[in-house]
Amino acid sequence: MRDKIKLVSSAGTGHFYTTTKNKRTMPEKMEIKKFDPVVRKHVLYKEAKIK
């Protein structure tokens, strides 16, 4: 089952992306480099729960 997750910027800007993830094939927390438009750079985004 694919669950919705939130990817939060590690730059501390509060910017986030939402996506889905298959928890059965990828049980560990996701970390991916994406573009943060607030600081206008590519930074590390870490998985967080959607509240």
UniProtKB/Swiss-Prot annotation:
Q: List the disulfide bonds.
A: none
Q: Name one GO molecular function term.
A: structural constituent of ribosome
Query: Does the UniProt entry include the keyword Ribosomal protein?
Result: yes
Q: SUPFAM superfamilies per the record?
A: Zn-binding ribosomal proteins (SSF57829)
Q: Which GO terms describe its biological process?
A: translation
- Keywords, sorted A to Z: Ribonucleoprotein, Ribosomal protein
Q: Which Pfam families match?
A: Ribosomal_L33
Would you tell me the Gene Ontology cellular component terms?
cytosolic large ribosomal subunit
Q: Is Ribosomal protein a UniProt keyword of this protein?
A: yes
Family from the record: Belongs to the bacterial ribosomal protein bL33 family.
HAMAP family xref list: Ribosomal_bL33 (MF_00294)
Q: What is this protein called?
A: Large ribosomal subunit protein bL33
